[in-house]
Amino acid sequence: MDPRLSHAHGALAGLALGDALGMPTQEMSPAQIRAVYGRITGLVDGDASQPYAPGMPAGSVTDDTEQALLVASLLIRGRGSSSGRVALNAVEFAHALLAWEDSMIERGSLDLLGPSTKAALDRVRAGEDPLTVGGEGTTNGAAMRVTPIGIA
């Protein structure tokens, strides 16, 4: 296997594993984690009290991994750009995220878009330019999706 491909697989696997390890503790303080789970030493189910992942099975990934893989698929598709460089179309990405959230809602998931991404996409839905709507966020959603960009 090409070492670059192996490294890409490793980076994405590491992202998914870290996400699955953190899934049951999203938005919980250290004290809450200790009270609900005690010491976590491996993959565990999301507790019923977990606000974003109640009852999610151990090893499940969250919106962070799903959206990173969405970025990866769009980057792969963008390799056919006329410049020969990797390209990620902002409009296509915005619409893909909207479709992703709609599918999550249909499945009954509580693990949806974060507030900054949601606010930006609501502006896209209202007809604003996707290249100008994301500058006011205060959350870390973009950092959760950046791994494929580093690989590209």
Regions found by a protein language model. Give the residues of each.
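Structured, active/binding-site neighborhoods that engage oxygen-rich ligands
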Residues: M1-A152
